[in-house]
Amino acid sequence: NTVCDYDPEEIKRQITISTSVAPISFGGCKINVLDCPGYFDFVGDVLASLRAVEAGVIVLSAKDGISVGAERSWKYLKAANLPTVFCVSKCDEEHGDYFAVLDALKAKYGSIVCPVTIPMSDGTGVIDLVHNVAYKQNGAKADKIDVPAADAGHVEELREALMETAAGATEELMEKFFETMELE
């Protein structure tokens, strides 16, 4: 259960049934997150929320992949011309496969799908592809570390793909990328 799923029926079913607001402070800014239902049965809440948001986050399970609700949410967010991020959760659960879900997203939505963060191969943290660093879980916090050698080759391939995709966003970024092969 999450902070937003407080209704007894939501707790019992372990799903979001109605949209709720969760304010978050980040970088000196207040961000109001609207937690909408993921199941297609509750699509009305998703459609109503589109009028109040500036971007969307579609959460996918590493075990289950792309659901009907996720596909519909993508269509609605795209039709509303809103930037969208896919977040793959439950990567640490049995039969969870982050990279299978990533491959499915790329197959369905094309090369515009590119990761910015991936799980470490040993399952103890995540790798930030933008800044080329890793964060290893240490109790309730994460320690910043170098990218593990076991992940370095794969990380380099994914970073290159990310930079190429980002470079295609504007003419200026494309020129910078072709000059330096980096976007930092």
Outline where the language-model segments fall.
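P-loop NTPase switch module centered on the Walker A-proximal segment
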Residues: N1-L60, I66, Y109, P115, ...
